[in-house]
């Protein structure tokens, strides 16, 4: 195993730690506490995923949050003026690359959902194995609340994880489903007490890291072919429609 790479300390919202066997744990945070998703997070994540992918010392990725939640807060203003084409263009670029790079990451991904996730729950549910806390709840707060359509990959991941009709129901009603419900539907593999979630995810990751690396890499590619293809087909239109609905906000009565 090589020394700690420079990119481990490059990004302010991601704490990275790698075991000797090659299990990389990515923890979302803001100043050491639960993360507030910002324009910086959105900009940095596709870059980080690219660096993770090209670092061949990374054998398995574990994704988790900080404290008692996975991700529930977002600073919409920090994403820029999405009502203008050039303002939304960078969000379009980043928004397509994040889910595609997760889908194409050549290693197993395990999510340790340590609590509620109402912002970018697709980051948790796209994982090959989802381990959730008994306190975890899933929903999509930002899109309809902010007046934009959900086209950044959430629509694809939810359809794959929940089923098409159920995904549409929860996206349009902004309803919340529990970890237990998600397990019943097949979206979550295991539901555990909060203090056991990360340890269990890392245990599974260590088991995978002990296998031949080409095996786990190519297994990940094989098992994610469908969702990778759907991301390539669906996020271009999805993000374009997000941009159109964002632009429309400037013309709504409350904006005048």
Enumerate the predicted regions with their spans.
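Hydrophobic, secondary-structure "cap" segments at the distal end of domains
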Residues: 155-165
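Well-ordered beta-strand positions
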Residues: 128-129, 169, 173-175, 181, ...
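Glycine- (often His-adjacent) and acidic-residue-rich active-site loop
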Residues: 57, 64-97
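Gly/Pro- and small hydrophobic-enriched strand-loop and loop-to-helix capping segments
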Residues: 128-151, 188-200
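Glycine-rich beta-to-alpha active-site loop
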Residues: 96-145
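Terminal peptide-recognition signature
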Residues: 26, 45, 63, 124, ...
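A short, well-ordered alpha-helical element
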Residues: 14, 37-61
């Amino acid at each position: 195993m090589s020394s700690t790479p420079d990119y481990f300390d490059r990004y302010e919202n991601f704490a990275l730690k790698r075991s000797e066997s090659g299990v990389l744990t990515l923890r979302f945070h803001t100043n050491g506490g639960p993360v507030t998703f910002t324009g910086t997070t959105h900009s940095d994540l596709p870059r980080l995923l690219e660096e993770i992918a090209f670092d061949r010392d990374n054998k398995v990725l574990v994704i988790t949050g900080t404290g008692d939640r996975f991700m529930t807060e977002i600073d919409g203003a920090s994403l820029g003026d999405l009502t203008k084409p050039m303002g939304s263009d960078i969000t379009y670029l980043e928004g397509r690359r994040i889910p595609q790079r997760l889908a194409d990451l050549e290693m197993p991904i395990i999510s340790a959902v340590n609590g509620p996730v109402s912002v970018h729950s697709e980051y948790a549910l796209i994982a090959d194995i989802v381990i959730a806390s008994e306190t975890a709840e899933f929903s999509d707060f930002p899109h309809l609340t902010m007046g934009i359509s959900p086209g950044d990959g959430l629509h694809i991941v939810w359809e794959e994880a929940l089923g098409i009709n159920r995904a549409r129901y929860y996206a349009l009603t902004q309803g919340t489903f529990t970890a237990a419900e998600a397990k019943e539907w097949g979206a979550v593999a295991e539901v555990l007490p909060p203090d056991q979630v990360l340890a269990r995810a890392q245990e599974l990751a260590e088991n995978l890291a002990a296998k031949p690396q080409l095996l786990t890499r190519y297994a990940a590619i094989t098992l994610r072919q469908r969702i990778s293809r759907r991301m390539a087909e669906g996020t271009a239109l999805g993000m374009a429609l997000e941009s159109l609905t964002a632009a429309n906000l400037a013309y709504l009565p409350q904006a005048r």
